């Protein structure tokens, strides 16, 4: 029995359009027994070209049939794509060096985690002055603090075993001070506000969960997509813990159909939504530290193991197109196009696919001819940067195969070696909301080059799906085809059992589906993390101010007189309830604006742009932005719907500047 025939009757429960429900576990077990060794696939990096394969008597690519039949065949898409990848690797003449993942020693994993979380000065030679870390720790939630404490204790025990003479402060003492200060707050306001903010979303979440649970009783075409807001004001791990403690959480089986996935949305925040790219580098660094701690805390609360991996450095190409690290590729691209954030070859391949139209049936699914793909690769390597490559000779399916090949042949995965296991573990989280929250944090943690390229890929995939009526590529089909290109490479040279491979197929396809469907939400920085950054900055300012006062006192400087003069100057310059907006690059460089309840950032921009003349008049909305600078934030680009009075109350010491975004 061939693998194609054996898999024909296997359907992922998550994608089954009918009311006949089977458990995922039983499906996996059955598939594991029936699968043959041809499904095995272990190598991560290899020179691969897509190739045609022998198909069933009823060609899987002839899909001008009902939508239900398309969904039932989606699992077949996964195995066909996997077979294409395997055959292309067998046909390739060159073998790229496999990325080796280092197995960490005892305590090494936790030590590396603390470094990544910005807490390296809690141990080692710098442990003598942990003040910066103490400020950082004082801003953490209880679940975040527990995650840090757990890992510090492991490192501490390991170092004692190795007789290392490092002084490691007991973070329980630090957190005891933190808890004491919170407990003495009048009325326990922090705990109450946390639960209040969470409870206002809880009813909506439960309602959405009920809709998901009842979906099987209603035909898919009549099922309304449940809508629920994502709570970005409260720590995700805190939400999970509170739901766990109150036993209100309804654990739902993963479902992949668009008809059953909740239609998550971001509630409007009067102080503005913060997206990746809106913050200054120094604040974004703090965001990444907090995102790692929050992700770990979420996995800890839900009992999911989170292990970071580290790739051993291997020799890679530093020029060319394929098998080149993203950073090296961007460096050579930026010499041609300054400010380039996405590889030129990646953009050109997407552009070539779209030039021929996205309505082509089987787009992304049907592979290009293996020999032709191999020849195109060699020709691209030789002529792309010279500008002499003939793009007219590239067929649409060939361009799609080259795009997938580019992703597979990256020396390290697009989802990064460090976090690919965490991406895979997303499938183990109990609810879709928690899976979405984890993916949000993981996207934040990706290196800039990986994150930007992933964003371009997901946006392209969505455009393909938008033409599903003609190209027969639903979100499930696209997820099934793309999942092995992003995830199966993560075996990193290790073989896996057939049953494990099937489980991974189901899980990674579901995760790919979530990445595509919720991509607009995933590039948002949660408000609770931004608030923690603000708190850290405030505490650091206080510390710096105390140090400055001591310095001024030693210098016998007339501090009081200076402060009075400075205060009187500021008070006279900006009346109460008015902000002064600076626009150094516009013809009107400054304007005093009265704050009102309804004044938005877009209104401020409109006032400036309406008064422009000459060359500056050509500026359009979207070319310049209003920034919040200083106070309790480094720098933040404001979205149009930010209510200025609310933000002013949150950060009264900020300056307001209109400028363009840096490249």
UniProtKB/Swiss-Prot annotation:
It is found in: Cytoplasm. The modification Phosphothreonine is found at residue 158. The keyword DNA repair does not apply. One of its GO terms (molecular function) is cadherin binding. Changing residue 365 to A: Abolishes GTPase activation activity. The record marks 365 as: Arginine finger. Keywords: Cytoplasm, GTPase activation, Phosphoprotein. Interacts with MPHOSPH6. Rho GTPase activating protein that suppresses F-actin polymerization by inhibiting Rho. Rho GTPase activating proteins act by converting Rho-type GTPases to an inactive GDP-bound state. Plays a key role in tissue tension and 3D tissue shape by regulating cortical actomyosin network formation. Acts downstream of YAP1 and inhibits actin polymerization, which in turn reduces nuclear localization of YAP1. Regulates cell shape, spreading, and migration. This is Rho GTPase-activating protein 18. The gene is ARHGAP18.
